[in-house]
């Protein structure tokens, strides 16, 4: 009986480990979007005033927060060394407000680094075709605590005025939820 329980426990653990390995391999690759149109240039899209509408869903898919964002965006500098400022004002459905100011730096190779007060270290991103992918760690306030959570953030240009954004939030590799946004350029 003990041997059967031990084997059952080992089998269950092996299946769980295998499932984790498979899900770890099933990620998007920015290169997959290289031929997609319209071609995204962050400097052009995030320039001027934008409105965004979004939801945060928990890991079960339930909407737990709705919000809007007003963004004022600008770029300065010479080609290959541009610096962008994305000034975001969030308003949540419960009436709370939040501000985040991204400072972006574009490299000659087309990659980006970004900083914001609530981002731990730097965000790294790259664009290909109609897509942009960011990876970063965010200090997320929940009640009276702040948690460091990781974001795998993907944006897809749909038209010259509309971009969709889907970001997966995780901690210790465990998915906590997703943020889905629609940006509209004025």
Q: What are the roles of these predicted feature ranges?
A:
Residues 53, 58-142:
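Central antiparallel beta-sheet cores of small beta-barrel/beta-sandwich binding domains
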Residues 152-186:
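Glycine-rich, aromatic-bearing surface loops/beta-hairpins
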Residues 63-70, 146-151, 175-177:
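Amphipathic hydrophobic-ligand
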């Amino acid at each position: 009986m003990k041997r059967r329980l031990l084997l059952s426990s080992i089998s269950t653990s092996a299946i769980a480990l295998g499932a984790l390995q498979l899900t770890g391999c099933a990620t998007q690759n920015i290169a997959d979007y290289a031929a997609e149109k319209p071609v995204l240039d962050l400097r052009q899209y995030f320039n001027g005033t934008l409105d965004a509408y979004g939801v945060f869903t928990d890991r079960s898919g339930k909407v737990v927060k709705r919000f809007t964002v007003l963004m004022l965006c600008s770029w300065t500098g010479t080609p290959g060394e541009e610096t962008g400022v994305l000034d975001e004002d969030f308003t949540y459905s419960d009436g709370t407000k939040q501000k985040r100011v991204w400072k972006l730096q574009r490299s000659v190779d087309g990659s980006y680094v970004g900083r914001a007060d609530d981002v731990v270290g730097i965000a790294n991103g790259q664009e290909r075709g109609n897509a942009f992918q960011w990876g970063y760690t965010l200090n997320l306030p929940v009640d009276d605590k702040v948690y460091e959570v990781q974001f795998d953030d993907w944006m897809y240009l749909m038209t010259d005025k509309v971009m969709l954004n889907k970001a997966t939030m995780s901690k210790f590799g465990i998915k906590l939820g997703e943020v889905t946004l629609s940006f509209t350029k004025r």
